[in-house]
Amino acid sequence: MRFMQRSKDSLAKWLSAILPVVIVGLVGLFAVTVIRDYGRASEADRQALLEKGNVLIRALESGSRVGMGMRMHHVQQQALLEEMAGQPGVLWFAVTDAQGIIILHSDPDKVGRALYSPDEMQKLKPEENSRWRLLGKTETTPALEVYRLFQPMSAPWRHGMHNMPRCNGKAVPQVDAQQAIFIAVDASDLVATQSGEKRNTLIILFALATVLLASVLSFFWYRRYLRSRQLLQDEMKRKEKLVALGHLAAGVAHEIRNPLSSIKGLAKYFAERAPAGGEAHQLAQVMAKEADRLNRVVSELLELVKPTHLALQAVDLNTLINHSLQLVSQDANSREIQLRFTANDTLPEIQADPDRLTQVLLNLYLNAIQAIGQHGVISVTASESGAGVKISVTDSGKGIAADQLDAIFTPYFTTKAEGTGLGLAVVHNIVEQHGGTIQVASQEGKGSTFTLWLPVNITRKDPQG
């Protein structure tokens, strides 16, 4: 069963790592496809309008060419242009000179007026090949304008006209090579297609961005869930250990303490009756000391596993830290260890059990003193941190190996030849009961720093520590 659960967890971790990459790749590919295809439909509509405009222009040129051979008058050309302008989708038709003055127009009233100014004609630069532009709205209809030089006669025809015989004594009229022809066709469908393409592309890109964002957020949320679940599993394991220890401690306390009291009493009895300095006296003292040690182990075990009842009150941390340092000052001075702490007047009072916090600090100090041995420094700092306070205890001792850092708060884990291995477990338990956290940073040979975070109000807890 456990193997199957591990397999599922491994598969879930693998999928959580690979799926976001796959989704991002697919979204990127789809986005490139959408962007690449953008404008294809509108381009097809535009080409259809251009072709329509060019066909009508060529038709007018052909009609004019035939008319020249038949000596077509201006009025007849105007009529031909008006007839062609009546084709479906044609908004207007015009022929201008090089200065933009209208020579022919689908609206006869506009003949002789300026369609465009000379400057505008310079910018338009009509050429032999057709050009186009969108005019926006002509009255109420969006228009696409197709224009080029008006060429009713190709170059060979123009060259031949100079040598043509006169008809009835008159030459066939020649056309100004700089005349330009303009046709405006209805571009409503083109504009609608462009708007639809833009709207659809934006919708698709927005949907892709939403999918991408959701995938990224899901990835981080899932990773956060995995971390939270792992923390909960670790916490459950620790609680299970404490429950087991609780049952063990209850049995040990019941079965051992009464005999221990008898053993200690007998040891003192024999010590008092044995000659001072003799072997029997020393053995009796060793028995009494070991009985005390075993009784202390049982007491610490009970302290660890029994429910902690906090006597909460407003605590001035500056006062509490100074008091706790005084309790270990004699031991520290005997080892030539300096104790350093500077009061921080900006610290807020916190709701806590002062006796329990003093116990926490004393355990940390005693561990630091044992880690230093002789000649060193223990520094204590306190500062405000978010909705709580942070207390750091730093020593110049031998440090903790990296592979041991994760186990130092485990009951009965110790790196010392002497000790029960319950001190830091008790510290962790008390800090947790206060709604706080404790972390350790250490390098072997460079000392250690234990950092406590405690909320100002015990109902609040900093999840990040």
Curated annotation (Swiss-Prot):
Entry's transmembrane regions: 15-35, 202-222
Modified sites of kind Phosphohistidine: 254
SMART domains (UniProt xref): HATPase_c, HisKA
Domain of life, source organism: Bacteria
Gene3D superfamilies the UniProt entry points to: 1.10.287.130, Histidine kinase-like ATPase, C-terminal domain, PAS domain
Enzyme class at the top of the EC tree: transferase
Cellular compartments annotated: Cell inner membrane
EC number: 2.7.13.3
Phenotype upon gene inactivation: Deletion of the gene does not affect the minimum inhibitory concentration (MIC) of E.coli for zinc or copper.
Induction, as annotated: Induced in response to high concentrations of Zn(2+) or Pb(2+). Expression of the zraSR operon is positively autoregulated by ZraR. Expression also requires the RNA polymerase sigma-54 factor.
Keyword Cell inner membrane: yes
Keywords assigned: ATP-binding, Cell inner membrane, Cell membrane, Kinase, Membrane, Nucleotide-binding, Phosphoprotein, Stress response, Transferase, Transmembrane, Transmembrane helix, Two-component regulatory system, Zinc
Periplasmic compartment segments: 36-201
Chief subcellular location: membrane
PTM summary: Autophosphorylated.
Recorded catalytic activity of this chain's protein: ATP + protein L-histidine = ADP + protein N-phospho-L-histidine
One GO CC term, this protein: plasma membrane
InterPro entries reported for this sequence: HATPase_C_sf, His_kinase_dom, HisK_dim/P_dom, HisK_dim/P_sf, Sensor-like_sf, Sig_transdc_His_kin-like_C
Membrane topology, from the record: Multi-pass membrane protein
Ranges in the topological domain labelled Cytoplasmic: 1-14, 223-465
Domain Histidine kinase: 251-458
Activity regulation info: Activity of the ZraS/ZraR two-component system is repressed by the zinc-bound form of ZraP, which probably interacts with the periplasmic region of ZraS.
Domain notes: Contains one high-affinity Zn(2+) binding site per monomer.
Summary of the function given for this chain in its UniProt record: Part of the Zra signaling pathway, an envelope stress response (ESR) system composed of the periplasmic accessory protein ZraP, the histidine kinase ZraS and the transcriptional regulator ZraR. The ZraPSR system contributes to antibiotic resistance and is important for membrane integrity in the presence of membrane-targeting biocides. ZraS is a member of the two-component regulatory system ZraS/ZraR. Functions as a membrane-associated sensor kinase that phosphorylates ZraR in response to high concentrations of Zn(2+) or Pb(2+) in the medium.
NCBIfam families xref list: PRK10364.1
Identification of the protein by name: Sensor histidine kinase ZraS
